Amino acid sequence: METTKKVTVETTIQAPVEKVWEFWTEPTHIKKWNSASDDWHTPIAENDLRVGGEFRSRMEAKDGSFGFDFGGIYDEVKNYEVIAYTLGDGRKVKITFKGKEDTTEVIETFDAEETNPVEFQQQGWQAILDNFKKYAETNI
């Protein structure tokens, strides 16, 4: 049996964990930060944040040349601490939120998929997380 490679991306945000959680989980906010670069956007975001609940977002190139759906089912939700889910293809993702005073560390670990090189996946997920940091710090 092949072992799935786990990849971790992380950042520290200058905002309290309650605000970071709100920005991460509410669809109105997700649509504004969920992209790896300025030429992409997320026109659709839905989120039923509870164990067994589903989430879905649609990421598209702004020029309409490409797009894909991203979604899964929540396995664990601990407010202001942990979100874990299983993607449609069976891969697992866990996000940990560590709040301390007015900063929040966000650590995201995911099972790598087998189509693209791990480095590209890590760069893509880190770029989205960096965009989230920028959005959160600009909107607190």
Regions inferred by a protein language model and the residue ranges of each:
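Hydrophobic ligand-binding cavity/cleft-lining segments
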Residues: 1-40
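Short, surface-exposed coil-to-beta transition loops
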Residues: 6-8, 66-71, 90-94
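Generic structural detector for well-ordered beta-strands
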Residues: 8-14, 48, 58, 73, ...
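A short, structured loop/turn motif at beta-sheet edges
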Residues: 17-18, 49-50, 75-80, 96-105
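Glycine-rich portal/gate segments that line the openings of hydrophobic small-molecule binding cavities
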Residues: 41-84
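Beta-strand/loop substructures that line and gate deep hydrophobic ligand-binding cavities in soluble
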Residues: 82-127, 132
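Short, highly charged C-terminal tails/helix-capping segments
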Residues: 135-140
